[in-house]
């Protein structure tokens, strides 16, 4: 495709290909002059909820099919599958030698990646960090697993209206694939090079419900705490917030707390 050489793409799971695509778009949009930057001070924090599940499926299938005749594994099996390989591939692409790792926290993965990037930059550990996440889990294991959890909508005849997280008739989500990426940069560093600045991160918060494997706390304790933590970190008051971007998976049990 337009972002990855076909030969190189064969060494990558689809989730990594998405990561490379969005990272290239973000770096280009940021205007970072990679050749004239201190590459030791540019990092990559890029997450995936599960990583190369398609690759795992393919290799497990090949093993089951050929095990009687002496199974053979693709030498790229592990490098394609692991969830931190996308961050590694992005750093290799640009020669970034700063902090490099993956986050993995289910649906909060990319948000955690951005939060970590913010914290490392304000600690002086990096001037800029390429941050985001990607996923490519539309595979038998991905679809079958979520279906077994009753997490997917059964409105197969009207997929365009099936995802309805704030409706009493919600019955699950629709799976998708793709990636998203931002370039976070220390403010003065960005100003000095005349960067196009979309927004400023004022603060971040993190928390846990400590309640259930998949269901959110019925009183929204984790959600309340994380917003309080973020406001405190940003030194802001609730009335200063104009917009709350809530996370709605459209499952029946998980999101009654969003209206509390």
For the regions a language model picked out, list residue spans one by one.
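Hydrophobic alpha-helical hairpins/lids featuring a short glycine-rich hinge
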Residues: 25, 30, 34-73
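Active-site-proximal alpha-helical scaffold in enzymes
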Residues: 19-33, 86, 91-94, 99-135, ...
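Acyl-CoA/ACP chain-elongation machinery
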Residues: 125-171, 204-218, 248-253
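Condensing-enzyme catalytic core mediating Claisen C-C bond formation in acyl metabolism
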Residues: 157-236, 240-243
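Active-site nucleophile and cofactor-binding loops and adjacent substrate-binding regions
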Residues: 11-16, 39, 76-84, 101-109
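Conserved small/polar residues in nucleotide/adenosyl-binding loops
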Residues: 256-260
């Amino acid at each position: 495709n337009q972002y990855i050489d076909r030969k190189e793409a064969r060494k990558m799971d689809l989730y990594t290909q998405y990561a490379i695509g969005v990272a290239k778009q973000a770096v280009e949009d940021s205007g970072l002059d990679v050749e004239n930057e201190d590459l030791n001070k540019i990092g990559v924090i890029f997450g995936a909820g599960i990583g190369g599940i398609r690759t795992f499926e393919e290799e497990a299938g090949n093993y089951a099919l050929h095990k009687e005749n002496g199974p053979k594994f693709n030498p790229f099996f592990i490098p394609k599958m692991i969830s931190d390989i996308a961050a590694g591939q992005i750093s290799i692409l640009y020669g970034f030698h700063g902090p490099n790792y993956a986050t993995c926290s289910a649906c909060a993965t990319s948000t955690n990646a951005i939060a970590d990037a913010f914290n490392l930059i304000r600690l002086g550990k990096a001037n800029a960090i390429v941050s985001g996440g990607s996923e490519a889990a539309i595979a038998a294991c991905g679809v079958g697993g979520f279906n077994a959890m009753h997490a997917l909508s059964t409105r197969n005849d009207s997929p365009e209206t099936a995802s309805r997280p704030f409706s009493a008739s919600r019955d699950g989500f629709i799976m998708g694939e793709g990636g998203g990426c931002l370039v976070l940069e220390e403010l003065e560093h960005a100003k000095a090079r005349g960067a196009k600045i979309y927004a400023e991160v004022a603060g971040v918060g993190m928390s846990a419900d400590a309640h259930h494997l998949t269901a959110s706390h019925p009183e929204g304790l984790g959600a309340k705490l994380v917003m309080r933590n973020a406001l405190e970190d940003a030194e802001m008051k609730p009335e200063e917030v104009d917009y709350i971007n809530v996370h709605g998976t459209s499952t029946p049990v998980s999101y009654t707390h969003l209206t509390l």
